[in-house]
Amino acid sequence: MAVGKNKGLSKGGKKGVKKKIVDPFTRKDWYDVKAPTMYTVRNIGKTFVNRTQGTKIASEGLKGRVFEVSQADLTNGEDAYRKFRLIAEEVQGRNVLTNFHGMDLTTDKLRSMVKKWQTLIEATVDVRTTDGYLLRMFCIGFTKKCANQLKKTCYAQHNQVRLIRKKMTEMMVVEVSSSNLKDVVNKLIPGSIGKDIEKSCQHIYPLHDVLIRKVKVLKKPKFELGKLLELHGEGTSKGGAASTAAVAKGEEGVKVDRPEGYEPPVLETV
């Protein structure tokens, strides 16, 4: 038997004792995620982040988070195949204020539209809104049978496809370049751009299922808190954006009564 000190006994504890497990959620705070005024449902969920510790500020950890929400949840409607991406841009108290960051169709919707015996037509365009957002828009559409057609297929000729694609591009540029971001989102929710394209292309070849398939935000203007608050319906007429909903619930200043001639005590160290 080896002679020497038993390290396990000298420490006064058993070898391999488990450390106390601390629940990581005790260090986190929950925040409400708010959607802009374009949507019917404003409170879209909750998110959490580690509390402020030292130089790590909680609100900075929230900015830039992207939330993907179904249109049905945002509008209390039935169009669940359209998904909107919202990005966190500002934190006011316990509220995370978001802005539009993109739109997409669900995979099952896209797959269900692609069928045999018809021509698929796609168009892409980069266009800038009046308030400085550069958007890349993708449009998709399908040919359909003419009235009283007996033939099984409904294929468009190459020159017809080119004309339809040109019309799609022109319509998207006209609709977006004359609108700000809020108006563009209001057009995307009911799918009005796709319906207008479908009507304008009827004389070239009958179309159906014409939709804006995807929208990407390529560039944004310089961030302005006042504009974001206007988008959330919190802008103020008096004193401008600075006095904003200056303060979210529970964070307003409290008036303290002081006797006349009161002077604060001088601190020895700062």
Curated annotation (Swiss-Prot):
Component of the small ribosomal subunit. Mature ribosomes consist of a small (40S) and a large (60S) subunit. The 40S subunit contains about 33 different proteins and 1 molecule of RNA (18S). The 60S subunit contains about 49 different proteins and 3 molecules of RNA (28S, 5.8S and 5S). Belongs to the eukaryotic ribosomal protein eS1 family. It comes from Ixodes scapularis (Black-legged tick). GO terms for biological process: translation. InterPro entries: Ribosomal_eS1, Ribosomal_eS1_euk. This is Small ribosomal subunit protein eS1. GO terms for cellular component: cytosol; cytosolic small ribosomal subunit. The lineage of its organism: Eukaryota, Metazoa, Ecdysozoa, Arthropoda, Chelicerata. Residues 235-270 are annotated as: Disordered. Residues 249-261 have a biased composition (Basic and acidic residues). PANTHER family: 40S RIBOSOMAL PROTEIN S3A. The keyword Lipoprotein does not apply. Pfam families: Ribosomal_S3Ae. One of its GO terms (molecular function) is structural constituent of ribosome. It is found in: Cytoplasm. Keywords: Cytoplasm, Ribonucleoprotein, Ribosomal protein. It comes from the Eukaryota.
